[in-house]
Amino acid sequence: MASPKLHDFRHIVVKVGSSLLIDSAAGEVRAGWLAALAADIAELHRGGRDVMVVSSGSIALGRSRLKLPRGPLKLEESQAAAAVGQIELARTWSEVLGAHGIGAGQILVTFQDTEERRRYLNARSTIAKLLEWRAVPVINENDTVATTEIRYGDNDRLAARVATMASADLLILLSDIDGLYTAPPGNDPDATLIPVVEAITAEIEGMAGAAGSELSRGGMRTKIEAAKIATSAGTHMLIASGKIDHPLRAIAEGGKCTWFLTPANPVTARKRWIAGTLEPKGTLTIDAGAVSALRAGKSLLPAGVIRVDGQFSRGDAVIVRGPDTHEIGRGLVAYDAEDAEKIKGHSSPDVMMILGITGRAEMIHRDDLVVGTAPT
């Protein structure tokens, strides 16, 4: 199968690892390289694409600033180093993107932010708003609070979760190697690059090597795990070398890389997850006007809700029924049951007055809603 083209994609997550971003000898950001990458991001941005960055580097920068000795760090040492390094990392991204007139928005996430539906919706909404404002979200694991037991452990899998959460259609993992080889190329001179992976088989998994360097917690195995997460959610993924200047331009020009393809798309995969995987915790009954709006692809507004049943929390799946009690669809609700009961039947501007906070305009956003076919 022919490889896709970079410019075929509109919503792109780029993962940048510590070993690329930080000069390990000097303990400093590789400023020239990062400026070249920022220029690549700006080019995609000018083309109307949404670009998100998952950036490692906070611990590496922090240990350099604090002049910590080489070798493994204890958990509390890593957390403290991240606290120092994160400030500089955020400033660095703000400066290099700002040079192209692009705002950068820092988002620090923990494992629970992508695994718990309420927090998942919060993070997803923040990313969506930054993209709407044409800013570039710069995302990293919040290493200052993450624990050994509850963490991603590497930014490859974090990037895959972010791509899934943001419904990205492409995840790019920039690495110190230009793709997946049939064997570790450093050990086997006959190893060949695999340009396209259509399915992640046991054979493909067996080709992955072991872990990375002192700066990087990731290796090829974690990249294969990331590919599983991404492709199952309808996101294509590629691994390419980030050691060169302008790595995204090189990909666009047909440079070496490995594509992991998926037959699905992010919206289809996400809606299949909502419709078929999540257990509904309640029911919203809506009026005929709201039924028509949903079938036309609109979001469900509080004004269209006439009844609330069940005990559910924000982010839970609920069933949506029409006035005749027939199921219209399912979705992730933006309010808990108590608040939904208070604002049902009211227009969106009334929500703030009723709840005393600035709530969301939608009871269920259309991206979080699966509507069945209309009865014939």
Swiss-Prot record:
Class of enzymatic activity (EC top level): transferase
Molecular-function GO terms, alphabetical: ATP binding; glutamate 5-kinase activity; RNA binding
One biological process term in Gene Ontology: L-proline biosynthetic process
Subcellular location, principal: cytoplasm
GO cellular component: cytosol
One family name in Pfam for this protein: PUA
EC code: 2.7.2.11
Keywords annotated in UniProt: Amino-acid biosynthesis, ATP-binding, Cytoplasm, Kinase, Nucleotide-binding, Proline biosynthesis, Transferase
Keyword Iron: no
Record domain PUA: where: 281-358
Pathway per the UniProt entry: Amino-acid biosynthesis; L-proline biosynthesis; L-glutamate 5-semialdehyde from L-glutamate: step 1/2
Protein name: Glutamate 5-kinase
Organism field: Rhodopseudomonas palustris (strain TIE-1)
